[in-house]
Structure formats: C-alpha cells, structure tokens
Curated annotation (Swiss-Prot):
This is Protein U26. Keywords: Membrane, Transmembrane, Transmembrane helix. The chain crosses the membrane at residues 4-24, 31-51, 66-86, 103-123, 183-203, 218-238, 243-263, 274-294. It is found in: Membrane.
Length: 295
C-alpha cells in the first residue's frame, strides 16, 4: 500500500511540474526575442541541473517555496519578472529531474504514477484557472512532506544500488550513446510532425493537457513510424475538412509516439544508468518546448 501511495504522490507532482508552462504565460504578448530568451533559459537550466542533484541529499521544500512564490507574482515589472521567470524555470527543472530519477529508482507502480499525473493535469485545466496556484501547491505538498521518508525506504535504497554512477565516481560517458541513436531519430521525426501540425492545424493556445496526458501513457506502445503516418493522415484530413476532431486525433497519435519512445527507453536503460531518468526528463521538456513555444 505504501508503494502504491508513493507512486501516486510521485505522479501527482510530475503532473504539476511542466517546465516552462507558467513562464510562457508570463511572456505572452512580449517580443519574439523575449520568448527566445525563455527557450535559452530552459536549456541552460536543464544543463545546470543535469547530474548535479543527488536524490539522497535533495530537499524539495526549497523548490516548493520558489515555485509557490513565483506563481503568486505573475504580473511584475519586466526586470523583476525576468528574475522570477529564471528562478521558476530552474526550480521546475530541478524538481522534475529529481522526480524522474526517483520514478526510475523506486519500485513504483506505473499505473499509479500515471493516475497521479492525470489527476494533477485535470485540475490544471482551464476550468480551474482561478485556483492554479493553490492546485499546484496542493499537488506538490505531498511529495514535499513525504520525500524524506521515501528516500530512506528499503525499496529506494535497494533500487539505488543498481545505479552505479551515483555510488562511485563515473561520468555520463558510461551510458551507451549508440543505443540512443534510434530513439533520437524517432524523436526528431515526431518532433517535426508536431511542429508541422502546429503550423497547419487549428491548435489554439491552451494547456494541451490531453496531449500531455497521452505523452505520459504507460499502458501500451505504438510503433513510432505508424504513429507518424497516422498523424500525417490527421493533418491532411484537418486541412481538407477543418474539424477540431482531427486536431485531437493528431495530438493522440503524436503523443502515443512520444510515450512509446519513453517507455522503450525506460525499459532499455533502467538498471543500467542513473541518468536514464534525466534522458526521459530531457525528452519530455523538449516536447513541452515544441508544444508551448514557437508557432
């Protein structure tokens, strides 16, 4: 029961932390240069947090306070809002990276993690916009309170023994980069499809929570190339008939393609590299950037 609860708590927090979502809202209506600055900040924060934070010595209360205070002050003078934006992105990136590592290390239940993500994303929908700060805080509070006990549990400590890079001095070069080539090609294909879909389909600015829910799917895999082919059909159908249903179908197939990459990557790299969680987190952040920024 404890594993089930901890898995749900991890999912609840992962669904609440979407790096760049609230920061993009702060930059709406600003110049393209400002939005490019957001992308650069996201990239820098990912590189700075990569490999640095050990889950055993991490305290989420610091990032919880930064995220909460940042979300309470969305309308600030330009200079001050830029500082808040940088702090918010860095904390979101660091928190989500730790969560991704913990999900990989712990003997967690994938359906429980996915359920937590769905619950969190549901309450982040537009119908609850007036309570977004409160909902984010409520989603992050359980992991903030429970985290200390979680990393001292026998399951976490046993899982950690499989991740040699954190237990001795090693480098990211121990990860077999050759196995990532296939995933990278598939990811770039779906990334391109998502970009094309944003250009040609009617995709209004929204939370895209349905898409993010599908991306986090853990129940079944779909061949990436089949998903891309179905997405092309959805784009062409949407151009001819201009029905919003095709946008939903497009998001569903592209999302399933991304989730298939992440599921395969997770099963192939789990127990081999401590950085597998970081790679999954990096892929997710790239998907979020493509969906929320640009076209």
């Amino acid at each position: 029961m404890r594993r089930l609860t901890d898995s749900f708590i991890l999912g609840l927090a992962k669904g609440a932390v979407i790096p760049g979502l609230y920061t993009f809202r702060m930059t709406e209506g600003r110049s393209p240069l400002g939005q490019i600055g957001v992308l650069i900040t996201v990239a820098i924060s990912f590189l700075l947090t990569f490999k640095r934070f050990d889950p055993r010595f991490y305290k989420p209360i610091g990032d919880f306070k930064i995220v909460f205070l940042s979300l309470m002050a969305p309308k600030l003078p330009s200079l001050l809002s830029a500082v808040v934006m940088i702090c918010l992105i860095f904390s979101e990136m660091r928190l989500r990276m730790i969560l991704s590592r913990c999900v990989m290390i712990m003997p967690s239940y994938s359906p429980a993690v996915f359920t937590g993500i769905m619950v969190s994303l549901f309450f982040k929908s537009q119908m609850f916009d007036d309570y977004s700060v409160l909902i984010t805080a409520a989603s992050l509070l359980p992991i903030t309170v429970r985290y200390g006990w979680m990393i001292r549990s026998s399951g976490f400590l046993l899982g950690l023994q499989k991740y040699r890079p954190i237990l001795k001095s090693t480098s990211f070069r121990e990860v077999d980069l050759k196995c990532l080539v296939k995933f990278t090609v598939e990811f770039l294909l779906l990334f391109t499809m998502l970009w094309i879909g944003k250009m040609f389909l009617s995709m209004p600015k929204s939370n895209h929570l349905f898409f993010l829910t599908v991306v986090n799917n853990v129940f079944f895999k779909l061949n990436v190339f089949k998903a891309a082919a179905c997405a092309v059909v959805a784009i062409l159908s949407g151009l001819m008939m201009n029905v919003c249903l095709y946008r939903i179908i497009f998001e569903a197939f592209v999302g399933l393609g991304f989730s298939s990459i992440m599921l395969t990557l997770s099963s192939d790299l789990k127990d081999r590299s401590f950085y597998a969680g970081d790679l999954l987190n990096g892929f997710f952040c790239l998907v979020v950037c493509c969906m929320y920024f640009g076209v």
